[in-house]
C-alpha cells in the first residue's frame, strides 16, 4: 500500500477515494455487519484461544526443520481444535459456562410464600395470534402478540403491518394500525374499537432501513454495536398517551464466556415515512435509548413487559446451579432442573402473568412477571421443583419459590395435558389439545392453593402453528396438589373459586379437616319464605292426619256393623 501511495498523485486520489467509500460502507451498512460483530463479542474468548494456538502452531511449524516434528505439530493442533469443538459445542460446555455466569450474576431472592395471581388471561397467545390473522386482509400480517399494560389494564397488542409475501409493500407502505385487545375477556374482539389507527414508518416486516431491527441497530453507537442487540418489539402507550414501539435490548456482558442480560429499551415514536425520516433512518437510525437505570423515571415502562424472553429463559435455566457448579453434570443432577416443553404447545415458557405480591412482604411490585415452572431434568419426572418470578420490566431481581425442598409434591406443567385429557375422555383429543398451563394461585378454603389454568385449542393438521380457539373456550383448572381437574365457565371468572370448592371441598375437608366455606347467608325474604313453606308443609301434614283419622273411623264403624 505504501509503495502504491508513493507512485504519484493519481494513486493517492484512488487510495483516498477507496478509503472514503470503505468508511461510507462501514457507516451506512452497520445493520448488515453488526451480527458479525456480535458473533465476535459472544465468542471472543474462544476466538482468542484459537488464534493464540494457531499462531504458536504456525510459528513452531516454520521453525521445525524435520518432517517428524512438523507432523507432530500438525497432529497436536488438529487434536486441540477437535477437542475444543467437542467439549465446547458438541457437549455444550460453552453454554454450560455461559449459564453459570448468568447464575453468578443473578440477584436471586428465595420467597417463602407464593404471590396471588390477578387479572387472569383467558385466551392463550397462539389463539389470539390466529384470531388476529383471521381479521386482516391478504396484504397484511400481524406481529406476534405481547401482553402489556395499557391504560391500567392488561392488553394483547400487535401491529397490523404489510405482509412479508409482497416485497414492494414492505418497501413503500407504513405500519398503520395496532390491535389492542383485552386479555381478561373470554371473547376478544378484533373490530374497529380495538384497531387503533397509528402510523409507524418502521415495522418488523418492513424492508431495508424501514425494518425495526435495522433502524434500531443504526441508532447504536460504536461501543453498543459490539455489545447490544435488538430483541422483542412491544407496542404500548407512553406517558403522554401516544402509541410507541418499545424494542427490548440484550446486552452481552463478560469476557470469559459472555452472557446476555437486559440492556434497556429503544423507544420509537409513531410517525409517517418522509424524506427527512428516511435520512434519519439511514444515518443515525430511529429511537430513544433508555437504560435499565433510567427506566424507573418513565411510568409507562415500570411494572411493564419489556424484558426479552431470551434473557429471562436463561436466567430461569441458571437455577440448575443452586446445588453447586457440578450438580447439573451427568453424574450428579440431584437438584438440576429444566424448563419443560409441552408437546404441541407452540408458546413456550415463560408465561407472562399478573401477580399480586402485596401480602408477601418482600418489597416486590405487583404487576407483570415472566413465570417459569421448573421441573427435574429427567424426561420422566414431571413434579414442580421451582416457581420462578422474573420482573417483566427488567428490574434486576429474580424471585423463586422452592417447592421441592418443602416436599409439597406438586405436579408440574408437563403433567397437566394428560390429566385434562383423562378427565374428559369423550373429547376428540386427536385434533384438540390443552395448551399453555399458566399458574392460578388463590386463597380458597382458608389457605393459598396453586392450580394450573389451561385452554383447549384446536390445532390445524396442515399447519401446527395455527391454533383455532373459540370465542368462549373450554377452560380447565388443575389442582397441582390433589391432581383433580375442574372445568370452569370462561364467561364467569367471579365464580371460579366457588366452582373449585364445590368439586374439591370433600377431598379437602377429609384430608385437611377444614371448615365449611362458601355457605351463603339467607336474606330476610328467604327466611320468611322458609317459614311459610314450613307452615304450609305442616298444614298439609295435619290435613293428611285428619283424613287418615276419618278413614280409620269409617273402617271401625264398618267393622262394628258386621
What does each model-found stretch correspond to?
Residues 3-562:
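Soluble extracytoplasmic regions of secretory-pathway and membrane proteins
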Amino acid at each position: 500500500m505504501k509503495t502504491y501511495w508513493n507512485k504519484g498523485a493519481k494513486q493517492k486520489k484512488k487510495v483516498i477515494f477507496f478509503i472514503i467509500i470503505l468508511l461510507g460502507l462501514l457507516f451506512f451498512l452497520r445493520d448488515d455487519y453488526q451480527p458479525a460483530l456480535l458473533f465476535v463479542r459472544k465468542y471472543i474468548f474462544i476466538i482468542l484461544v484459537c488464534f493464540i494456538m494457531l499462531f504458536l502452531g504456525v510459528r513452531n511449524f516454520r521453525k521445525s526443520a524435520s518432517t517428524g516434528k512438523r507432523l507432530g505439530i500438525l497432529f497436536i493442533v488438529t487434536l486441540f481444535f477437535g477437542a475444543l469443538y467437542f467439549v465446547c459445542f458438541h457437549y455444550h460446555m460453552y453454554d454450560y459456562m455461559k449459564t453459570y455466569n448468568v447464575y453468578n450474576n443473578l440477584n436471586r431472592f428465595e420467597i417463602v410464600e407464593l404471590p396471588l395471581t390477578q387479572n387472569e388471561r383467558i385466551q392463550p397467545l397462539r389463539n389470539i395470534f390466529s384470531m388476529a390473522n383471521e381479521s386482516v386482509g391478504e396484504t397484511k400480517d400481524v406481529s406476534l402478540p405481547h401482553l402489556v399494560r395499557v391504560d391500567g389494564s392488561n392488553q394483547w397488542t400487535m401491529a397490523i403491518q404489510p405482509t412479508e409475501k409482497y416485497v414492494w409493500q414492505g418497501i413503500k407502505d407504513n405500519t398503520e394500525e395496532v390491535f389492542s385487545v383485552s386479555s381478561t375477556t373470554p371473547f376478544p374482539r378484533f373490530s374497529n374499537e380495538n384497531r387503533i389507527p397509528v402510523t409507524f414508518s418502521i415495522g418488523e416486516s418492513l424492508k431495508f432501513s424501514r425494518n425495526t431491527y435495522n433502524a434500531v441497530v443504526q441508532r447504536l453507537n460504536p461501543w453498543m454495536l459490539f455489545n447490544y442487540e435488538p430483541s422483542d418489539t412491544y407496542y404500548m402507550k407512553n406517558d403522554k398517551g401516544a402509541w410507541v414501539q418499545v424494542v427490548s435490548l440484550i446486552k452481552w456482558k463478560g469476557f470469559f464466556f459472555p452472557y446476555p442480560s437486559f440492556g434497556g429499551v429503544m423507544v420509537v415514536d409513531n410517525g409517517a415515512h418522509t424524506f427527512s425520516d428516511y435520512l434519519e433512518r439511514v444515518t443515525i437510525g430511529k429511537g430513544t435509548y433508555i437504560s435499565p437505570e433510567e427506566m424507573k423515571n418513565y411510568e409507562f415502562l415500570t411494572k411493564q413487559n419489556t424484558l426479552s424472553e431470551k434473557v429471562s429463559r436463561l436466567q430461569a435455566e441458571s437455577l440448575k446451579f443452586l446445588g453447586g457448579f457440578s450438580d447439573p453434570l451427568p453424574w450428579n443432577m440431584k437438584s438440576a432442573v429444566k424448563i419443560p416443553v409441552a408437546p404441541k404447545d407452540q408458546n413456550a415458557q415463560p408465561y407472562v402473568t399478573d401477580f399480586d405480591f402485596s401480602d408477601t412482604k418482600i418489597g416486590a411490585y405487583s404487576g407483570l412477571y415472566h413465570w417459569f415452572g421448573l421441573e427435574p431434568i429427567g424426561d420422566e419426572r414431571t413434579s414442580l421443583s421451582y416457581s420462578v418470578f422474573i420482573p417483566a420490566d427488567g428490574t434486576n431481581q429474580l424471585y423463586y419459590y422452592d417447592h421441592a425442598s418443602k416436599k409439597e409434591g406438586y405436579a408440574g406443567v408437563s403433567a397437566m395435558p394428560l390429566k385434562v385429557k383423562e378427565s374428559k375422555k369423550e373429547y376428540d383429543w386427536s385434533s384438540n389439545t390443552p395448551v399453555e398451563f399458566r399458574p392460578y394461585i388463590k386463597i380458597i378454603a382458608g389457605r393459598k392453593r396453586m392450580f394450573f389454568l389451561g385452554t383447549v385449542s384446536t390445532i390445524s393438521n396442515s399447519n401446527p402453528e395455527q391454533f383455532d380457539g373459540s370465542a368462549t373456550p373450554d377452560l380447565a383448572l388443575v389442582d397441582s396438589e390433589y391432581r383433580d381437574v375442574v372445568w370452569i365457565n370462561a364467561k364467569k371468572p367471579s365464580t371460579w373459586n366457588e366452582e373449585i370448592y364445590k368439586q374439591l371441598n370433600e377431598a379437602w375437608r377429609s384430608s385437611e379437616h377444614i371448615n365449611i366455606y362458601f355457605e351463603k347467608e339467607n336474606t330476610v325474604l328467604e327466611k320468611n319464605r322458609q317459614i311459610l313453606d314450613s307452615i304450609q308443609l305442616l298444614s298439609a301434614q295435619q290435613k293428611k292426619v285428619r283424613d287418615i283419622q276419618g278413614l280409620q273411623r269409617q273402617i271401625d264403624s264398618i267393622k262394628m256393623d258386621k
